[in-house]
């Protein structure tokens, strides 16, 4: 997740329900994000032609927040028209407009299309690679105008739901913390604030009885925690986390993410994420966990 500056250019008081525009390339999770916002009591309208948006907003009279799904596949879509519309809405006094852009790497979008066996809407008679490339180029100026960009390349539907809820759920919730485990072989996860390398700890992978298990299992956790270096490392991580959370909360941050990495992303990093989650929960902290290398679901 990449938040940018305040979504509205004007400084007047907000007098209308918030407006969220959700867009992004096909296959990046736009529909999922809209569904989450609808569950949060937003009035949702998907695939609205661009020419109808200004009139809808000008009509006013809404009694709850509105989310509009803007699809680059629409017949009247043009990058210039959408950028102009975004600028117009952000300049409207009394209206808080937020542009949420769902993004993903080209190879991930291609994989999602191949898994669903769908043709790409911008190249129905040509290769999907060409369609993905065209759409990413087409949407780049819109991405640059967006207030929040969520890269869903490494997210499944549940993790995207959690991200959207943290951003748009009603105010008053606690600062949400998400903990991640990962394998360095696949690179550091996107959208994380702090990363810890756990590869110095004893590796359960080399124990045949533990290799088939993961860090959610007690026997693996016991093995990792038996390393004399574990407790000192964990205590420092916990102290650092607990000292940072109030500062981030005061700054208005709604979400803080911490990632633990090891060689395979199955044992040590999972153990650290699970152990920290339990410790933070005992402090009354809202926590979610994501183990990237363990099985998950794909976005649609």
Swiss-Prot record:
The keyword Nucleotide-binding applies. The keyword Nucleotide-binding applies. Keywords: ATP-binding, GTP-binding, Nucleotide-binding. ATP binds at residues 24-31. GTP binds at residues 71-74. One of its GO terms (molecular function) is ATP binding. Disulfide bonds: none annotated. Displays ATPase and GTPase activities. Belongs to the RapZ-like family. NCBIfam families: PRK05416.1 (NF003828). HAMAP family: RapZ_like. This is Nucleotide-binding protein TM1040_2438.
């Amino acid at each position: 997740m990449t938040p940018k500056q305040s979504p509205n250019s004007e400084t007047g008081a907000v007098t209308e329900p918030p407006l969220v525009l959700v867009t992004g390339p096909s296959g990046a999770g736009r529909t999922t994000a809209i569904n989450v916002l609808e569950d949060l009591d937003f009035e949702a309208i998907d695939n609205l032609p661009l020419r109808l948006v200004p009139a809808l907003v000008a009509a006013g009279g809404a009694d709850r927040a509105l989310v509009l799904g803007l699809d680059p596949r629409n017949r009247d879509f043009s990058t210039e028209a959408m950028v102009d519309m975004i600028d117009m809405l952000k300049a409207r006094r009394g209206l808080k407009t937020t542009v949420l852009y769902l993004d993903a790497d080209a190879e991930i979008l291609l994989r999602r299309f191949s898994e669903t066996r769908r043709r790409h809407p911008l190249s129905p008679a040509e290769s999907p690679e060409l369609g993905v490339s065209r759409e990413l180029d087409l949407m780049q100026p819109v991405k640059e105008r967006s207030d929040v960009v969520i890269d869903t390349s490494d997210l499944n539907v549940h993790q995207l739901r959690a991200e959207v809820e943290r951003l748009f759920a009603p105010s008053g919730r606690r600062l949400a913390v998400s903990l991640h485990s990962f394998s360095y072989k696949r690179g550091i996860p996107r959208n994380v604030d702090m990363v810890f390398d756990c590869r110095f700890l004893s590796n359960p992978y080399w124990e045949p009885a533990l290799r088939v298990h993961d860090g959610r299992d007690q026997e693996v956790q016991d093995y990792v925690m038996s390393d004399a270096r574990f407790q000192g490392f964990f205590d420092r991580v916990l102290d650092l986390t607990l000292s940072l959370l109030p500062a981030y909360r005061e700054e208005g941050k709604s979400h803080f993410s911490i990632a633990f990495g090891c060689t395979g992303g199955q044992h040590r990093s999972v153990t650290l994420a699970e152990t920290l989650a339990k410790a933070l929960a005992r402090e009354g902290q809202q926590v979610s966990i994501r183990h990237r290398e363990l099985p998950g679901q794909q976005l649609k």
